[in-house]
C-alpha cells in the first residue's frame, strides 16, 4: 500500500518522536534534582559494585550514563555483556517516560554510555555470563531507577531454580516484591523489571514432574515499610519424590533491596534445603548460588526478597494510603486478590 520511502519516513518519525520525548523527560528530572545529584552505587551479593553517575556532553548536549567505578569482571557467572546494560537503560528510560510511545531505538538517541572495559558490565571474551542476564541486569536496573530518584529497589533477581536428572530438566523463575515509589506501593509476588517469565501452574507442575508443591504463598511482611510499602516476596516449597540435582541462581540473599526517602529495606531472600538424615531433618541454608543432590522426600524452600519501601513509615496510615494508591486486582486465588486489594 505504501512505498519504501514512505515506510522509512514513518519509521524515522517514530524514532524522532521517542528521542524528543526521552530528551524532555531527562531535562525535567535533571532540572528537578540537578545532574550532580543523579548518581548511585549498588552492590551484588559478592560485593561487586555497580556505579553510575550522569554528566552532560558539552559538545552535543547528550546525557552520559557513566559506569566508571564499576568492579572488574568477576570469577563467577555474573558478568554482563555491555548489551545487557543498554537493555536495562532503554527499559528504564521507557518506564520513566509518562507519554504513550512505542519502545524503539530512538529512546537511547539522547544519551551516551560509558562502560569500563574488562569490568563486570563489559567482560572479556571467555568470561562466564549466564547470571549477567538474569541477576546483574536487575541490579543495573535498580541502580538506574534509584539514581533518578524514581523507585526503591525491587527484588533484584529472577530467582532461577532448576532441577532434573539424565532423563529430564525443569527451569523456573520465581516472583518477588516490587519496590515502592513516591506515588504507590509495590506489588507483591510479581516478576519485576528485566524479566517477563510466567511460572508453571501448580496442577501442571505436580502432574508432569516428580514433585509435590507444598507451599506457594505470599511472604507476609517481607516488603519494606514506609509511607508506601514495598511489595512482599513469595514462599515456595517443593518436595521431591525422586533423587534429583537441584540448583539455584539468585541474588539479594546478602544485600537487602534498599528503601528510599526514609523507607525501610525489603527482606533479603533465603534458600533452604530441608534434608532427611535418618529420622531427623536438617535445615541447611544453601546460599544464593548452589547446586545440591537432593533425595526423595527432601524439600527446597525459596523465600524471595521483598521490595524496598518509600518514605518515612511514621507518615503512613492505611486510610491516607488508600486514597493515593489504586491497587491492581491480584492474579490467582481469591486469597491473593484479597491481599492485593485490601492489605
Model segments located where?
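Glycine/proline-enriched, intrinsically flexible loops and inter-domain linkers
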Residues: 1-343
